[in-house]
Every structure is written in structure tokens, then in C-alpha cells.
């Protein structure tokens, strides 16, 4: 069954999609720093990230300084477990 999942990579990329396994989001050469699940809060215009990956664990936000987010999410807030990612700078690609 497909689920809305995300991972973050050592290079800072947020990889997001609807997949079977978190590893399906990784590209060759990516090193995963954890992952979880996502949903869009349309009322608050926010990308809500939560949970953890059973393969890679909880996202290790402290290991990145800049989160590279797909351009299609520009203008949306980004929260993990209901908290803003204040310590991480967000850039779009």
C-alpha cells in the first residue's frame, strides 16, 4: 500500500512522495538522515511532517543547516510534529 512519506538527505534535500518504502524516495548516492510521514494542512497552508521511518529513524534536523524543499511547496509553512523548523533555513529548488 502507498503512503505519503518523506526523507531528508545528508545534502539537505527533502524528498517527498507517496511510496511503499522510505527508501523509494532516495536517489543513487543519497545518505538518509531519517524520515516520516507528511500531509498538507490546507487551512493553515502548511506542510505537516511527522513520525519516523522504521528503516532510517526520526529525522535528524540538527545535522543540516539548510533544508532544500521542492519548488512546488513555496509559500507554505513547514512544521514537524506541530513545531516550526526554526533552526533550519529553508531554500527551494
Predicted regions and their residues:
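Eukaryotic phosphoinositide-binding membrane-targeting regions
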Residues: 1-93
Amino acid at each position: 500500500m502507498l503512503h505519503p512519506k518523506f526523507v531528508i538527505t545528508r545534502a539537505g534535500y527533502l524528498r517527498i512522495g507517496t511510496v511503499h518504502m522510505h527508501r523509494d524516495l532516495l536517489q543513487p548516492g543519497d545518505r538518509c538522515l531519517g524520515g516520516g510521514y507528511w500531509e498538507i494542512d490546507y487551512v493553515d497552508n502548511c506542510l505537516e511532517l511527522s513520525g519516523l521511518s522504521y528503516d532510517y529513524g526520526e529525522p535528524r534536523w540538527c545535522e543540516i543547516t539548510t533544508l532544500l524543499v521542492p519548488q512546488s511547496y513555496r509559500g507554505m509553512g513547514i512544521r514537524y510534529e506541530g513545531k516550526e523548523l526554526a533552526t533550519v533555513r529553508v531554500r527551494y529548488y
